[in-house]
Amino acid sequence: MINRLFSINNIKNGSKFFSSSTTVETKQPLVLLEKHLVNGKYTGIQIVKLNKPKQLNALTFEMGVDYKKVVDTLAEDKDLKCVVLTGEGKAFSAGGDLDFLIERTKDTPENNQRIMERFYRTFLYIRSLPVPIISAINGAAIGAGFCLALATDIRVVSNKAPVGLTFTKLGIHPGMGVTHSITNIVGQDVASYMLLSSDIIKGDEAQRLGLVLKSVESDQVLPTALNLAETISKNSTIAVNSTTKTLRNKYNSDLDKSLTREADAQSQCWASKDIVEGILAIRESRDPKHNYLLFDDQK
């Protein structure tokens, strides 16, 4: 298995950021929970941090276990008014774990369909909370990492953070409900561009396209998100929560269908040669050569 971290500096031409779960780290919670205090008093705002910084907070089933525990803890907080989701270190979440992808190529379409849908639902579980969720995208948000941010209610991003949905470049159908969420957020044109091109853009361009609410300097991402959370939390809790539920109703109405469709489509992609080429390209730090016979310079 590959054991190096694919970071911004060793990805050729914007290939997806991946890491390997075999990298050794000191055992600690993979998701952190912190109460936001002002003058020593709890504001009703909780900060959730994905905590695998050496691997750019890659999403894994192991992280999903800690993530669900944190969401369950939040659900028991009677004073909860808002949640801010962010990443520890330099990344928000830079995609999937490479070892996990390799394992999927060895499994059957039937198992992969079931596994992927369960994986999606684990990380979308945070949407079961009745309060607004704000993503503070402090750094790279790629693939599944950006899908997670797009599933929240409001997004603030670092203006230089790379964000993108690089599934088709990898050789796989998009997942985690993103075919549904991004269309609801920005419409068909921008959704098609982001999903079909696999382009990685910077945070300021993401704001221009309407993918995020605000683009700020990297050291202002969390403070800006917390300021938004404080503004929201000063309003009527029952009104804010009921409005949040109403706003999510449209999103949720077709989400189950999208999750099932995505998981099924991904399960078929796992059995193709394209995903193998995509993974090989990541391991070799190069662009994948999908459909290479169509291009003279790649023969």
From Swiss-Prot:
EC class of the enzyme, as a word: lyase
Keywords, in A-Z order: Lyase, Mitochondrion, Transit peptide
EC number: 4.2.1.-
CDD domains, A to Z: crotonase-like
Keyword NAD: no
One of the record's GO molecular function terms: lyase activity
Gene Ontology BP, a term: fatty acid beta-oxidation
Keyword Mitochondrion set for record: yes
Transit peptide (first-last residue): 1-14
Compartments, record wording: Mitochondrion
GO CC field: mitochondrion
Family, as annotated: Belongs to the enoyl-CoA hydratase/isomerase family.
Protein name (Swiss-Prot/TrEMBL): 3-hydroxybutyryl-CoA dehydratase-like protein, mitochondrial
Organism of this sequence: Dictyostelium discoideum (Social amoeba)
Taxonomic lineage from the root: Eukaryota, Amoebozoa, Evosea, Eumycetozoa, Dictyostelia
